């Protein structure tokens, strides 16, 4: 039980974790909490003689508090503090390998979920963070005072590059700011990435010339190797595209951070899709909450990330969703358990990420979405644009008109 230290005073530089743990029957909570702290830091299953060659007091994780979860039988929140020295600077990969790498398969636990992490400024300052952030993006696009509008091109698979470009053009001409590759559009036999990039670029510039607005399409650079991913991002930049896209969980944090550095150095915005997140965050008592994945993404680098909708076809509770939306956008977020925020998080000067509301939303949801997400967001309507009975461009017009109306009503102080 050397890892259970209820009298420990946490330091400003400690990385703090809140685990929701369900011990096996007969295992005391303190023992389970100590086991989590040990296995995710310096411990192993037995005492080893080489422990004497280092200072465990300096390097060990400490379980410093355990509280039972109200209304749940045999479930606890265990708070663990990790010394900063345990982690490589600027590596989300290393952070996750340490904290969630091994401990989730632990025999003494029936289930374990990482609910939240407190990242101290001493650590967060070693990360690149979003390549550009919210303000720089608005300046690049010269679009202010309203949410941005996007649309995922459907059917997501099976279109030829030529027809894909046509769909993009229709949407952008109608008034959307962005269109998007679906997360699983990479480079398949029916549409190789280069053909898609070329026909999309043509559509972009045509729509820009017609509307006088800057347009973007999230060109998905996700690939089977980092080298191939960079090749696609470089080609997108050469075409003059303003934004590329990456699936950060399937692509991996290492690839994601490499891409973020490239995007910052070359003036590309980076849109992040969270494909595979529900595998990790859907279970209520095992895995990892999305707010942890959102914090990790803000450090690893991305200018947009999908963040649920509160009103569409995918799961998400309003307060909890708003909790991690604030964690993405704001500099300083107060601890608030009702919104699932277990720790006060101070991002200091790290730029914010724009949350993207996407998944089963349509024009009818517009008042709710403008109210819930506010101006710094991207509202993404896939079927909600392309499903318009008159076609893509009228669908885009409908969305833009609805958005402008809601923003005007809000600015006049009317209740949405």
Swiss-Prot record:
The active site is at 154 (proton acceptor), 273 (proton acceptor). It is found in: Plastid, Chloroplast. It is an enzyme of class 4 (lyase). InterPro entries: RuBisCO, RuBisCo_large_chain_AS, RuBisCO_lsu_C, RuBisCO_lsu_C_sf, RuBisCO_lsu_fd_N, RuBisCO_lsu_N_sf. The keyword Disulfide bond applies. It catalyses: 2 (2R)-3-phosphoglycerate + 2 H(+) = D-ribulose 1,5-bisphosphate + CO2 + H2O; D-ribulose 1,5-bisphosphate + O2 = 2-phosphoglycolate + (2R)-3-phosphoglycerate + 2 H(+). Binds 1 Mg(2+) ion per subunit. GO terms for cellular component: chloroplast. Its cofactor is Mg(2+). Pfam families: RuBisCO_large, RuBisCO_large_N. Its EC number is 4.1.1.39. Substrate binds at residues 102, 152, 156, 274, 306, 358. It comes from the Eukaryota. Belongs to the RuBisCO large chain family. Type I subfamily. PANTHER family: RIBULOSE BISPHOSPHATE CARBOXYLASE (PTHR42704), RIBULOSE BISPHOSPHATE CARBOXYLASE LARGE CHAIN (PTHR42704:SF17). RuBisCO catalyzes two reactions: the carboxylation of D-ribulose 1,5-bisphosphate, the primary event in carbon dioxide fixation, as well as the oxidative fragmentation of the pentose substrate in the photorespiration process. Both reactions occur simultaneously and in competition at the same active site. This is Ribulose bisphosphate carboxylase large chain. It comes from Arthropteris beckleri. The lineage of its organism: Eukaryota, Viridiplantae, Streptophyta, Embryophyta, Tracheophyta. The gene is rbcL.
